[in-house]
Curated annotation (Swiss-Prot):
Signal peptide interval: none
Superkingdom per UniProt: Eukaryota
GO cellular component, one term: chloroplast
Keyword list, A-Z: Chloroplast, Plastid, Ribonucleoprotein, Ribosomal protein, RNA-binding, rRNA-binding
PANTHER family cross-referenced by the UniProt entry: 30S 40S RIBOSOMAL PROTEIN, SMALL RIBOSOMAL SUBUNIT PROTEIN US4M
Pfam family, one: Ribosomal_S4
Record's subunit section: Part of the 30S ribosomal subunit. Contacts protein S5. The interaction surface between S4 and S5 is involved in control of translational fidelity.
Protein name in UniProt: Small ribosomal subunit protein uS4c
Localization (cell): Plastid, Chloroplast
Keyword flag rRNA processing: no
Main localization (coarse): plastid
Organism of origin: Staurastrum punctulatum (Green alga)
């Protein structure tokens, strides 16, 4: 299944939850009673929707998500938490969490177009897995830094307008940024409380239990 490129508001309305990585637009309040709506759903449908939250928030394909689930199963620790850590430590997501891009698709473009350095080398692979002690910076080019300046300013405005992006009000503790010199660093692996989307990762693991 390919990466979703359709209307983003349609997705957050369907899932009835904000997905700040997908779009900076706030969710429109629904008149449907969420509790009664949940009762009408099958267990499979509930697991499917939790899986879709991850897929659309991080902007990855079904095949990519399944691969991450398989990696998480082979790692030590809780499969669900390891899965979230793998997704959060992607380079495109880290650029987003640093406020250098308004959404993960926008962060992916910055990476794809060669604006981002990791340990002083250009990395143009959005799925690149960042590790603790790695340094991230923006290329010393006028265009690269102008794009990031614009995004940093817009990010501040977006936080004021959209309550769903309150978690973006400050850089998470596993990251550090110096906006004056366009440099950041990864201090540690992200912890569960700093995950950028509200999701029940155990239901996602259950969804893939017969596939991974």
């Amino acid at each position: 299944m390919s990466r979703y490129r359709g209307p983003r508001l349609k997705i957050i309305r369907r899932l009835n939850t904000p997905l700040p990585g997908l779009t900076s637009s706030p969710i429109v309040n629904s008149t449907v009673n969420t509790k009664s709506q949940r009762k009408d759903k099958s267990e499979y449908r509930i697991r499917l929707e939790e899986k879709q939250k991850l897929r659309f928030h991080y902007g990855i394909t079904e095949r990519q998500l399944l691969r991450y689930v398989r990696l998480a199963r082979r790692a030590k620790g809780s499969t669900g938490q390891v899965l979230l850590q793998l997704l959060e430590m992607r380079l495109d997501n880290i650029i987003f969490r640093l406020g250098m891009a308004p959404t993960i698709p926008a962060a992916r473009q910055l990476v794809n177009h060669g604006h981002v350095l990791v340990n002083e080398r250009v990395v143009d692979i959005p799925s690149f897995r960042c590790k603790p002690q790695e340094n991230i910076s923006i290329r010393d080019r006028a265009r690269s830094r102008a794009l990031v300046d614009k995004n940093l300013n817009n990010s501040q405005e977006s936080k004021k307008l959209s309550p769903s992006r309150d978690f973006l009000s400050k850089v998470p503790t596993h990251l550090r940024i110096n906006t004056k010199n366009y440099k950041a660093s990864v201090n540690q692996v992200v912890n569960r409380n700093s995950i950028g989307v509200k999701v029940n990762e155990l239901l996602v693991v259950e969804y893939y239990s017969r596939q991974a």
